[in-house]
């Protein structure tokens, strides 16, 4: 579900706002969103690693993406109907949509793998996928621990390190494409698109980490 499809953090006039705190439901849903993002990352990594003989299908990846959309909608619906929230409303909305973006971009990269008829993934792509799995694992840990904030700061540090590593890897991957004078231009286009979709997933993970960092500071 792309940004904007989830709605707004503003409460529509027709929505009934509950004055009974349901703060624990936010933590449950964020934990579920993190788990779903990790499931997507692992599926996509396996699809790339085992391609073209992987038994992971694009339909399976899409199903996880759809499940993530449902969690995002549930979070925003809860946000729009609760007067009392565990932390800043804008941060809740941003975190929900950034986690959703992680899964969306992973699904896009997986889809391009099939659409472009890629015969064999490159080592760069497989390394990107491995970095994403590790980063999303830390994101899922942070989401699981939002309620008590235990271990969240270390997870954020680890994610930042992986994002820096991913940035360097993307530059190397693109350079390797343009360094070969005899490469088919179509191959350059295909892999540039796939590399950049994977990088967008990692960037969304970093943005989610930044939102969590703001939450930690505001609630210290």
PLM region spans:
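Cytosolic, long alpha-helical scaffolding segments
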Residues: 2-220
């Amino acid at each position: 579900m792309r940004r904007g499809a989830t709605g707004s953090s503003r409460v529509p006039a027709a929505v009934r706002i509950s004055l009974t705190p349901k703060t624990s439901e936010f933590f449950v849903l964020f934990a579920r969103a993190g788990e779903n993002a990790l499931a997507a990352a692992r599926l996509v990594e396996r699809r790339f690693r085992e391609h073209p003989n992987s038994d992971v299908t694009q339909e399976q990846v899409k199903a996880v993406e759809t499940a993530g959309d449902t969690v995002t909608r549930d979070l925003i619906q809860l946000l729009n109907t609760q007067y009392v929230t565990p932390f800043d409303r804008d941060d809740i909305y941003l975190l929900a949509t950034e986690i959703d973006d992680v899964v969306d971009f992973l699904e896009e990269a997986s889809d391009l793998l099939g659409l472009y008829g890629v015969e064999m993934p490159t080592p760069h792509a497989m390394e990107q996928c491995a970095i994403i799995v590790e980063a999303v694992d830390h994101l899922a840990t942070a989401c699981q621990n939002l309620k008590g904030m235990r271990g969240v700061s270390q997870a954020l540090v680890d994610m930042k390190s992986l994002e820096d590593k991913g940035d360097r890897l993307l530059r190397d991957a693109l350079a390797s494409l343009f360094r070969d004078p005899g490469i088919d231009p179509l191959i350059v286009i295909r892999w540039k698109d796939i590399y950049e979709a994977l990088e967008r997933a990692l960037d969304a993970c970093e943005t989610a980490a930044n939102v969590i960092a703001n939450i930690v500071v505001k609630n210290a």
